Curated annotation (Swiss-Prot):
Protein name, per record: ATP synthase epsilon chain
Location of this chain's protein in the cell: Cellular thylakoid membrane
Top-level taxon: Bacteria
UniProt keyword Phosphoprotein, yes or no: no
A molecular function GO annotation: ATP binding
SUPFAM superfamilies on file: Epsilon subunit of F1F0-ATP synthase N-terminal domain
Phylogenetic classification of the source organism: Bacteria, Bacillati, Cyanobacteriota, Cyanophyceae, Synechococcales
Organism of derivation: Prochlorococcus marinus (strain MIT 9211)
Entries under PANTHER family matching the protein: ATP SYNTHASE DELTA/EPSILON CHAIN, ATP SYNTHASE EPSILON CHAIN, CHLOROPLASTIC
Length: 135
């Protein structure tokens, strides 16, 4: 048995294929999907989607969205996504370090718009780094 996985971003079709297993970064934690999974809809957090195809694991950095599981089909609609193989690991590491620095400089500004944006950039940078390390 297998799953059909589609990962769609506004600007591109990131992944469309057959998978043996999918691990989604939902807003309530990691969610494993196998063939025969119950139908559901869940919110997707910024993080790394893992997909097993032909016994091999691949990673996709996701930037928030929604996922639907229905009849062995998993459709993931996200704000943005990148295959780990398309991410330059050293660039991702530099962006992560820069995002950490910028976020740290905003300490004490708990509810400022600037700090919220910096936190979002930090989460995106972290997801890109994690995707390259788990590829």
């Amino acid at each position: 048995m297998s799953l059909t996985l589609r990962v769609l971003a506004p600007d591109k079709n990131v992944f469309d294929g057959i998978a043996e297993e999918v691990i989604l970064p939902s807003t309530t934690g990691l969610l494993g999907i196998l063939p025969g999974h119950i139908s559901m809809v869940t919110a997707i957090d910024t993080g790394v989607l893992r997909v097993r195809t032909n016994g091999n694991w691949d990673s996709i950095a996701l930037m928030g969205g929604f996922a639907e599981v229905e009849s062995d089909e998993v459709t993931v609609l996200v704000n943005a996504a990148e295959l780990a193989s398309e991410i330059n690991a050293s660039d991702a590491e530099s962006e992560f370090e820069q995002a950490k620095t910028e976020f740290g400089q905003l300490e004490g500004q708990e509810n400022s718009t600037q700090k919220i944006k910096a936190k979002e950039m930090l989460n995106r940078a972290r997801a890109r780094v994690q995707a390259t390390k788990s590829a």
